[in-house]
Amino acid sequence: MKLTFNKNLYAFLLMLSVVFTAFAQEKVKPIIKDGEAQIVEAFNNPDEWIRHDLWVETSFDTDGDGKLDRMHVAVTRPKQTETEGLKLPVVYESSPYYAGTAGFSEGTFWNVKQELGETPKPRIHPEVTRTGKRPIISNSQIKTWVPRGYIVVHSSSPGTGLSQGSPTVGGDNESLAPKAVVEWLCGRAKGYTTPYGNETVKAYWSTGKVGMTGTSYNGTIPLAAATTGVEGLEAIIPIAPNTSYYHYYRSNGLVRSPGGYLGEDIDVLYDFIHSGGEEPLTPMKNTKVNDANLPNQLFKSKREYSNAMVRDTEMKNGMDRETGDYNDFWAGRDYLNDMAPMKAALLMSHGFNDWNVMPEHSYRIYKRAKEMGLPTQIFYHQNGHGGPPPITMMNRWFTRYLHGVNNGVENDARAWIVREDDPRDKPTAYEDYPNPNASNVSLYLSPGAPKKGGLSTKKITTNKSETLVDNYSFTGSGLAQADITNHRLLYVTPKLTKDVHISGVPKITVTLSSNKPAANLSIWLVSLPWQEGRRAKITDNIINRGWADPQNHKSIRESEPLEKGKFYTITFDLNPDDQVIKKGQQIGLMIFSSDKEFTLQPEPGTELTIKLDETSLTLPIVGGASALTSAFKN
């Protein structure tokens, strides 16, 4: 049988072959729509993700073995980064928590029942049992970002998990460790397949554009990395970050616990996270430490060495739990002091009712970043600790600065605040925070103890003083609700006839004397009447809080004993806030001494006498004095 050649059919089949080949060779890439990275189905199958781990070499040695510490890093990436040579930007999260933490057994925290200024009694030191299996460090972030065309990277911070080194809780190595990981992602640092070997591994799948995010300690680390100015870290989204360990464990010279963790201090957190360093410190003959502050001894493990060097020497000598004063130890753990090199675009998130990592932590960094001219946005919600911005905000931020898409995010509103009755994913846009229409209004006190005194915009000379008696056994909420008590002073505004919008940082000035050389000073702003029961919301009752040590009336670096009968004036900020106080409520200023939820608890009986004429409250009110006085009128 003779076959006849058909040129038309051949041409058609050839064209079809070219089309199929071109289609087969078309590579998957991220999809951007409306300024946001979209979920790409080809990236959305977890079974096809490539997961592997490695160790990145840092520039420091903090575990005493004489070798540069290596950080344990895990990578999750779409298969196309291997099969098609696709390069993608990176979303990176680092944490000290991934490999387990110590428990809260009795004696782990400092005993807060002590006299002020006394040396505290010793506490116990729990050990962490490391958890986790290679190659996975964490599964956080991956379901959000890998399908949208990102690679997700995790690392354990120094001295935790399989990362070498020592935890320092805000020390330099906790900034330099994520810096090294970013540099590896950008091709400038060495990565290894094992913690001690020489076989290298490269991040050939990375575009060299890195963003970082995380919550709480995991949110602190992005800021720490950004303060190094490392090239390639383009954007960070810290969520409820601790930006100063002094501000976390102290207030204006006062020893003050973070909310929910009474008796915690920086060394407690060190023990809580120290899951690494179980391996022997070898060779043993080289582990003898000659340090004036340490016994001349051999250490059995890296963990033992780190405990001696960091917890039992640096922290013990620097944290100063006796006075609560600010010093160089704390200054070295305050990221505000390190921001000069920072270049990363900053989107911050925090809750106004976060009494663990308080809202001042984000505001102080946001404010400085604005002054530096960095791209900045801030998202505040009305809840407690944690809580990211809406995914749309995060997506637009990373799309702009990691994918490099000009989506106009830098022209969006600078501040986004969730109003009291709105869901968290429906924030209200504002030109900035604090509200540009807010101005400071001073309020003054009139007598009323042991009941309630007055709080108004009119200053009336009374030449009167009122006295409270410290007793830590009473809670702040109980004192605020009491009709009569000599354990607090409470001054209230008239009942509001209109809503009052507070936006900014309230300030308090108190002139006081004490019958003892040391005293706690606690300030609450409250909304009255107090709401109880299931219907009470987190935005009810407590408007703001603040604490101070009257011994530090001159400076948070210097304290002096109080002379009996002598009056001292101390001025300090409360926390940033943006809250609408509803009409029908009264704003109350409560002054008391020991705060059962936050401060040390000395024996009851200390008397604080307040000069009313020389004590005042400053509130940032949207609409200023006219708005507030109008709300006071019947």
Would you name each region that the model predicts?
Residues 28, 40-43, 59-61, 68, ...:
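Accessory cap/linker subdomain of secreted extracellular hydrolases
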Residues 355-361:
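Conserved alpha/beta-hydrolase "acid-adjacent" motif
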Residues 146-162:
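Conserved alpha/beta-hydrolase
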Residues 370-386:
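Catalytic histidine neighborhood in serine/cysteine hydrolases
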Residues 25-115, 130, 139-141, 151, ...:
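Catalytic-loop region of hydrolases
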Residues 28, 35-37, 379, 388-634:
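C-terminal, loop-rich substrate-recognition/catalytic regions characterized by aromatic stacking residues
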Residues 132-135, 161-178, 189-192, 384-390:
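Catalytic nucleophile-loop/oxyanion-hole region of alpha/beta-hydrolase
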Residues 342, 348-350, 354:
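Short beta-strand/loop motif that positions the catalytic acidic residue
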